[in-house]
Amino acid sequence: MSNKDIRVVVGMSGGVDSSVTAHVLKEQGYDVIGIFMKNWDDTDENGVCTATEDYNDVIEVCNQIGIPYYAVNFEKEYWDKVFTYFLDEYKKGRTPNPDVMCNKEIKFKAFLDHAMNLGADYVATGHYARIHRHEDGHVEMLRGVDNNKDQTYFLNQLSQQQLSKVMFPIGDIEKIEVRRIAEEQGLVTAKKKDSTGICFIGEKNFKTFLSQYLPAQPGDMITLDGKKMGKHSGLMYYTIGQRHGLGIGGDGDPWFVVGKNLKDNVLYVEQGFHHDALYSDYLIASDYSFVNPEDNDLDQGFECTAKFRYRQKDTKVFVKRENDHALRVTFAEPVRAITPGQAVVFYQGDVCLGGATIDDVFKNEGQLNYVV
């Protein structure tokens, strides 16, 4: 089958990465369709809907490239699958990662299903990751060539079935080259700045946004031995290892969040970047997903490396099944400020094996007060 007989539906955001993705596929001769996903009603404080601006950029890019385009609304799916999860996690005192859930439930589920209904053979996005297709048909996901932009951390929940239908055309090139291609082609998005932060918050103040949905409950900020250091403005506004926004003055080392007590509405703080309470030996994680589950013996356990947050260096770990629903991930050396609700993502070299959601964090067999 020649490329012209292969239909690829590209998820287009109005940014430079997805614009170049569509251009590259068109140049390679594929039958390309651009689709803009509207996942959130994101009118800003001035009454301007940024999604409209982004869609206008998609229209212009698609016209420049010479491909058809559509818009599809996934606001209900996004609310049900991503935003509800986001709020529930904050209610539990955890720090969620909505990008991971958005990829799992929207971009590579709702959008993938929609694309297949349009007769697509594959979907493509502007993610910095790579797909390796083996002769027997199974696939592996590899880190993007641009280490600084690699996005496999956020794609850790994707299954073999999902990835077999996915292309990441810019995963083999660096961001600077993506910009160069966009400028060379005269694409209107060539100099558009990258979006940052959580898509549904955008440029809004995080505290203000969250308080619209969850009532803040101020409480005491104390040390682990009970010394009161001040007031917090609501546990949901703080994450493990956080330094800024505590409002604790005085001399000596800066103060950091080392735990939360939901029952008593207490925020635990301690002084010093390397305070002992910030370090742990192992974690328990649930909702785990592996691209090739049969390659990993969870009963015997296996060694690999892991990331506990985006752009963090890999850490050597040992992964083993804890029970039917959870994994135990033991670190080769203590790790600082691991955060419940975030993803732990596993690697063998450049291959992303999969990931899980961090539930509890332990030191010397004792559970830390990260979220209790």
UniProtKB/Swiss-Prot annotation:
GO terms for biological process: tRNA wobble position uridine thiolation. It catalyses: S-sulfanyl-L-cysteinyl-[protein] + uridine(34) in tRNA + AH2 + ATP = 2-thiouridine(34) in tRNA + L-cysteinyl-[protein] + A + AMP + diphosphate + H(+). Disulfide bonds join 102-199. It holds the Pfam family tRNA_Me_trans. Residues 97-99 are annotated as: Interaction with target base in tRNA. It is found in: Cytoplasm. Its EC number is 2.8.1.13. Residues 149-151, 309-310 are annotated as: Interaction with tRNA. It is an enzyme of class 2 (transferase). The active site is at residues 102, 199. The keyword Acyltransferase does not apply. GO terms for cellular component: cytoplasm. GO terms for molecular function: ATP binding; tRNA binding; tRNA-uridine 2-sulfurtransferase activity. ATP binds at residues 11-18, 37, 126. Its main location: cytoplasm. The record marks 127, 342 as: Interaction with tRNA. HAMAP family: tRNA_thiouridyl_MnmA (MF_00144). Catalyzes the 2-thiolation of uridine at the wobble position (U34) of tRNA, leading to the formation of s(2)U34. Belongs to the MnmA/TRMU family. PANTHER family: MITOCHONDRIAL TRNA-SPECIFIC 2-THIOURIDYLASE 1, TRNA 5-METHYLAMINOMETHYL-2-THIOURIDYLATE -METHYLTRANSFERASE. This is tRNA-specific 2-thiouridylase MnmA.
